Amino acid sequence: AFICSIVGLSVGQHLTLVTNPRDIEGFIKILRKRPFHLLPGVNTLFQALLMNPKFKELDFSACQLTVVGGMAATPETAKRWREVTGLPILEGWGMSETLGVGTANPFNGTEYSGNVGFPLPSVDINIRDDDENILAINEVGEMCIKGDNVITHYHNIDNTTFFTADGYLKTGDIASMNEQGAIKIYDRKKDMIIVSGFNVYPNEVENIIEEHPKVAECSVVGIDDKLQGQSVKAYVVKADNSLNEDDIKALCQENLAAYKCPRHIEFIDELPKSTVGKILRHKLRKLAHEA
């Protein structure tokens, strides 16, 4: 949103600041009052808007671009967003250490791509294994970045764990790069679940669960398991009270390898989120540990 605001100001656009985006009714009133051309947000915000019947009554003819950042957009959200607004969701990636942005999809994109786009000019990105070896096209590892907009060190701490030997920042994101140079992010390295030696990316499991029409939103974490090291636990917010564990398990078993399927499912009234709407998995891990 910050980068979109700067871009908007640079071309003379009027900015409308929604001070409480969690007030979906109030948010929709603002969108109805002011024709909007660009709408940036996080996936959970778009999910909440889509669940409100009044959102579908808005006039989207002026809107030219919707951008998701901060967390991955789920395919189901992108699909429903296109059906309601007629617009694709475009994703980008960045962090504070890259001045907010490091990759972006072309603004003239017409379809949801499932990736976060291409490195910006003067930015170099590669994918590395745990020994800092650069991986081949489409291989999965940690995304590392270097460029004019990327920090070169942290102040007053040992930087060896945060940078490669040749000066690339380790982002902590598990990713791959395709033949065209587009980056696909699978998950945060710290959120990856290891079940009997196999890697499970929470985003992949969440994408499947959110395909169920009775699911409002969900989040997946790893919990300690004496036999497997870790097992998968899903926290699910219902969109329909008739939803049950068997519904979730059947969907996952149909679409995921057995080790990726949640062994534990807990229904919850709402997911813990940051002030900008990002789901806080560390709080869910703490909740699971205390259970």
PLM features: residue spans?
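Conserved ATP/PPi-binding loop(s) of AMP-dependent carboxylate-activating enzymes
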Residues: 118-122, 133-162, 200
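Beta-strand->loop->alpha-helix junctions that form or flank phosphate-binding loops
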Residues: 90-97, 117-119, 221-224, 266
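Active-site glycine-centered loops adjacent to acidic/histidine catalytic or metal-binding residues
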Residues: 70, 94, 117, 173, ...
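AMP-binding/adenylate-forming catalytic core of the ANL superfamily
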Residues: 32, 39, 147, 152-153, ...
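Glycine-centered tight turns that cap/initiate beta-strands
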Residues: 54, 62, 86, 122, ...
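Acidic/polar alpha-helix N-cap and adjacent early helical turns
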Residues: 287-291
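Conserved AMP-binding/adenylation subdomain of ANL enzymes
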Residues: 1-38, 52
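Gly/Ser/Thr-rich phosphate-binding loop
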Residues: 10-13, 36-41, 50-111, 124, ...
